[in-house]
């Protein structure tokens, strides 16, 4: 079993030194989608840039995610797929993470659900054509999908994927396309300290 780490960045990740023990592990495959690939200078990131890219901007990154999933899915050894931002750093050893992921059913995915706010529903969901056809869930933008769920996602019709490509902050909703299936645990695979960010913003 190998774990695909899907890096979605502007260019270089912020703290590459924390990833040294991870990137050398034989049970990892790395895939990078950078908005500015020519600015990527970290050797292991440059080596693992995917060939096809999508235009991205804040709140519009789902197409890039799908390209990462599609590229990583081509390797049949990849069983788990974890989305990573440029600000992420490992907080557990890879061995601990690997044991944790192996301890569950191979089909299990980990997606942390969030509450859909009134703003989400009125300004993000209802502004999209044919929104009534989808049973929405909201979730953290970083998660871990199993190969089973990645295949289900990639098999969705183009118009269903396009809906989330065009949706503002669609990266927090597009797992709605697979939410009806089994083997999904409401669990956060990453830790986001938004309270610290809020404090910093208030100080500016």
Predicted regions and their residues:
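ER/Golgi luminal nucleotide-sugar-dependent glycosyltransferases, focusing on the catalytic module
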Residues: 1-204
